[in-house]
């Protein structure tokens, strides 16, 4: 069964990015898409797709987009429930922002940009909490890890 982010919504103005992430069994290949929807006739359509070899650290060529506007794979940057429950997430996390705060530029490791602000956050920016940020003791193990 294939489910698209955004459910059955097919209106690009209101549905969000509608990503679909698929790991092809037996091939070690990840497929990711952007603005994916199912037509009335049952056909799946995507505005763009990208394939990733999960056995390689190779990046897309500079200026190439992917299912993600930054040109990066999404799946490896997502929080996994098992990591959060263990209290540690040993990799970078993918976060998203409204277009209005994203710069129309990118920095490594990103390969592409799609923002519309000249002074915003560049695609690929590495962000972190200030060292002075106090993690509330009442937060769950998962919330603290994230």
Walk through the language-model features, giving the residues of each.
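A surface/extracellular/periplasmic glyco- and lipid-processing/surface-interacting theme
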Residues: 2-146
């Amino acid at each position: 069964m294939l489910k698209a982010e955004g459910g059955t919504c097919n209106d690009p103005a209101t549905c969000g990015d509608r990503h679909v992430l698929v790991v092809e069994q037996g091939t070690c290949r990840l497929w990711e898409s952007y603005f994916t929807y199912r037509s009335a006739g049952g056909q799946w359509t995507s505005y763009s797709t990208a394939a990733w070899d999960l056995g390689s650290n190779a990046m897309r060529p500079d200026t190439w987009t992917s299912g993600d506007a930054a040109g990066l794979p999404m799946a490896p940057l997502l929080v996994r429930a098992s990591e959060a429950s263990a209290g540690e997430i040993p990799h970078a996390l993918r976060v998203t922002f409204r277009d209005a705060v994203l710069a129309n530029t990118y920095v490594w490791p990103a390969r592409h940009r799609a923002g519309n602000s000249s002074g915003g956050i560049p695609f690929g920016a590495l962000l972190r909490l200030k060292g002075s940020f106090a993690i509330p003791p009442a937060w769950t193990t998962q919330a603290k890890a994230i």
